[in-house]
Regions:
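Short, flexible helix-loop junctions that flank or precede catalytic/ligand sites
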Residues: 1-313
Length: 313
């Protein structure tokens, strides 16, 4: 019974195209939420004991400590349902009452269709011809990883492409993919050093998380390889400011940074803002014009348009 409920949750999430599933404890029930794109919606409220058992089921499959309900835990697994396998990442923590919450990240390990409202992949690819560092920013589920892989296939076909990810999200037979495992010393820093010995034409680094990672990314870019990576920021100018916060100098950025792409999924499609110079002074004119066009064409509401526009005060 518990396994059937768990499988139905994963089945439903996959059908909806959800990125995350949330089990939220209340006083005497569990609420189930799913996030699709930028929207998080409540699916329903369910029996507390039954859904606590569902959480324990997922934890067991992911190799987590089922008896520990207060301390935070992380886990991952390939979950079987309908003769399919779904890659999951799990995170749990208990509240002050000892009631456990669970977030499941669904990894879409097959490439998703990436539809842009106003851009074409081939046109975007023309921006990535110079060697150096290219950064992709945007919220979770905005298609950053998919876009990086699409560009890798179109620009670097037949060349040496490597990726360093945590975890590997899109499995590719035509590139060498490395996965972090800090328990055995496979950190971003060490894997970047290792990958450079293979002299890749393109190195994809899953995410810039801290100053140590960004230093390694900059060093890799200085070797002459082309490097793709993602970073958390809310605009192109925000990417530049974030790099400075992490300790990269303006002089280094002038040498290695070849382009910044900011993207979001809005109204069922993606929109992109790209810059290859003057990042700190970049104006979101193109971005806001795209938002206005989506509003005019009826794809988003006026409230969504105001929310999605970028302004610098």
């Amino acid at each position: 019974m518990v396994q059937e409920i768990a499988q139905e949750i994963i089945r439903s999430a996959r059908k909806k195209g959800a990125q995350d599933i949330y089990f939220v404890p209340k006083l005497d029930a569990y609420e189930l939420h799913m996030r699709v794109g930028d929207e998080r919606c409540k699916i329903g409220s369910y029996d507390f004991e039954k859904f606590a058992a569902v959480i324990s089921h997922f934890k067991f499959v992911a190799g987590m400590n089922v008896g520990e309900k207060r301390r935070s835990q992380l886990g991952s697994c390939d979950y079987a349902y309908d003769q399919k396998m779904s890659s999951l990442r799990l995170s749990t923590v208990g509240d002050y009452r000892g009631h456990e919450s669970l977030v499941i990240r669904l990894l879409h390990d097959e490439e998703q269709d990436l539809h842009f409202w106003f851009q074409d992949i081939d046109e975007l690819g023309k921006q990535y011809r110079q060697r150096g560092l290219y950064l992709f920013a945007g919220p979770v589920g905005s298609g950053k990883t998919t876009l990086m892989h699409e560009l890798a296939k179109s620009i670097f076909k037949g060349q040496q492409v490597m990726s360093i990810e945590d975890p590997v999200e899109i499995k590719q037979d035509d590139m060498l993919q490395l996965q972090l495992n800090e328990a055995i010393g496979l950190t971003y820093e060490n894997l970047i050093k290792l990958s450079l010995r293979h002299r890749p034409d393109l190195l994809i680094i899953g995410e810039i998380r801290d100053s140590e990672t960004v230093r390694a990314v900059v060093r890799a870019s200085l070797t002459g390889a082309t490097v793709f990576s993602t970073i958390h920021a809310k605009s192109i100018r925000g990417v530049y400011e974030r790099l400075l916060e992490l300790g990269v100098s303006e002089e280094e950025l002038a040498v290695v940074l070849q382009g910044v792409c900011y993207q979001r999924l809005i109204g069922g499609g993606g929109i992109v803002d790209f810059a290859n110079k003057d990042y700190q002074e970049h104006q979101p004119t193109s971005w806001n014009e795209q938002i206005d066009q989506l509003l005019k064409d009826g794809h988003i509401t006026s409230l969504q348009a105001e929310t999605e526009k970028i302004s610098y005060s």
